[in-house]
Amino acid sequence: MWAMSGALRPWALILARSPGARTYAGGGGVSYTQGQSPEPRTREYFYYVDHQGQLFLDDSRMKNFTTCFKDPQFLVMFFSRLRPNRSGRYEAYFPFLSLCGRERNFLRCEDRPVVFTHLLAAGPAPQRLSYCGGGEALAVPFEPARLLPLATNGRLYHPAPERAGGVGLVRSALAFELSACFEYAPGAPELPSHVRWQGRRFALTMDLAPLLLAAPPP
């Protein structure tokens, strides 16, 4: 169990074990019950992260700010243990897995499992991008030259931890702020070619494109 999630995990367990708990049947023929125990002393839970970086129980009927998980400790524990799902269970529908002892926490995502939500305040140290509500504890160095604007969906991407797929989505509000720093080549208004950041001009490397485009859709 998540040792620190006293307010959150009991709620999830009550939901899963209550007489009203239901088996969820999603697309692709997948079905599960929150808190199911496929083998002794093992529990399985199922989650979903949206394009804003909000984490929900996957079978929540309403997915909004009110129903998402907000406890920073829980979010840090969950996302810091995130790995590709190679468990042999639900791999096609839940491509990522966060393990806590004998508890399996499966994750699917609207776009990417890592969603950058905030650019942390500048200081003497290099700037960092924080993701999925984890503050300083879930952050990577900000690399402006490696920002990837994708014309096919109008979204912005940035390098993420390799264990979480190597590419993260930038939340729309933050992407809008960063887009003011882009420069476009003459006659090519679709995609920027450079970014200006803190008085410097960087050519966009676009090196994330092969990794992102090669990934199967979630």
Curated annotation (Swiss-Prot):
Family note: Belongs to the UPF0598 family.
Tree of life domain: Eukaryota
InterPro entries cross-referenced by the UniProt entry: DUF4505
Organism: Bos taurus (Bovine)
Organism lineage string: Eukaryota, Metazoa, Chordata, Craniata, Vertebrata
Name of the featured protein: UPF0598 protein C8orf82 homolog
